């Protein structure tokens, strides 16, 4: 009996669908969607972001943390 492999659903980049060219560090509501409960950045294989937008999100989160808009840790 042969088993059929289940194909993984390819996640699409939400930021590409929204046609965003720039991820603003002041948009904390958008950036908080890419953080875990503890405040860590969620990897792109879980969020479905493309490489370009994942880098932009990473830089924006780090800038927002430096400015004090996002916490480093959520306790």
UniProtKB/Swiss-Prot annotation:
Residues that span the membrane, as ranges: none
Keyword Hydrolase applies: no
Domain of life: Bacteria
Pfam families cross-referenced by the UniProt entry: Ribosomal_S18
Any one biological process term the GO annotation gives: translation
PROSITE patterns according to UniProt: RIBOSOMAL_S18 (PS00057)
Family: Belongs to the bacterial ribosomal protein bS18 family.
Subunit structure: Part of the 30S ribosomal subunit. Forms a tight heterodimer with protein bS6.
Name listed for the protein in its UniProt record: Small ribosomal subunit protein bS18
Species this protein is from: Thermotoga petrophila (strain ATCC BAA-488 / DSM 13995 / JCM 10881 / RKU-1)
Gene: rpsR
